[in-house]
Amino acid sequence: MLTIAGVEFESRLFTGTGKFSSSQLMMESIKASQSQLVTVAMKRIDLKTGADDLLSPLRQAGVRLLPNTSGARNAKEAIFAAELAREMLGTQWVKLEIHPDPKYLMPDAVETLAAAKTLCERGFIVMPYVHADPVLCRRLEEVGCAAVMPLASPIGTNQGLVTEPFIKMIIEQAKVPVVIDAGIGAPSHAAHAMELGADAVLVNTAIASSASPIDMALCFKDAVDCGRRAFEAGLGRVQTQAVHTSPLTGFLQQ
């Protein structure tokens, strides 16, 4: 069972709500994934009414909402978006995203750390999206973040675990859950992340942009489950030389 800020999650697959062709398809995919934590971009919500056709079905489905600050270019904008989410959605949870460059969508480490410190002081449950930087992740943990969300590769690229060496370091040192976010493009990527010891993965593009999002959601669910079970079972040690599984010459001496 995964626990974040005192809340237990049976599913270690978190999902997003963007890029789906319809709200109905989004909901069917989320249901198939069995995800219990779903991200929602504040920029998609009508600021005048707080309405969006995805909020009602998500609430009816009983999933926990994780509003994100996507679109924020600095700490000030991210803090404003988080406060808005708390007021409009009634949640302390926030996925902190600050990426000032719209071309590459790389997270701004300096602004993210500053925003995280302020938000944690204000009582938010902060889950920051960041580079796979072990030093930064430790700093975020120290200021009170409930989890860290290092990227596997650039958002939406489906490149997989390009940052694997650094993700391993983050997992090894972390005292809070590590959720691999961004760039996971195939169920095999998700399974591998879980085999490394990640606590969860967040997937959006790979499911939403699939020819069959519902089937892909099922695949990711199974991949995450299998990857976690493999990690808990204990993977065999990687060797540089061949190691025989049984004596090679014993029968010759009989």
From Swiss-Prot:
Its main location: cytoplasm. 1-deoxy-D-xylulose 5-phosphate binds at G156, A182, G183, N204, T205. It is an enzyme of class 2 (transferase). This is Thiazole synthase. It comes from Shewanella sp. (strain MR-4). The active site is at K95 (schiff-base intermediate with dxp). Its EC number is 2.8.1.10. It catalyses: [ThiS sulfur-carrier protein]-C-terminal-Gly-aminoethanethioate + 2-iminoacetate + 1-deoxy-D-xylulose 5-phosphate = [ThiS sulfur-carrier protein]-C-terminal Gly-Gly + 2-[(2R,5Z)-2-carboxy-4-methylthiazol-5(2H)-ylidene]ethyl phosphate + 2 H2O + H(+). GO terms for biological process: thiamine diphosphate biosynthetic process. The gene is thiG.
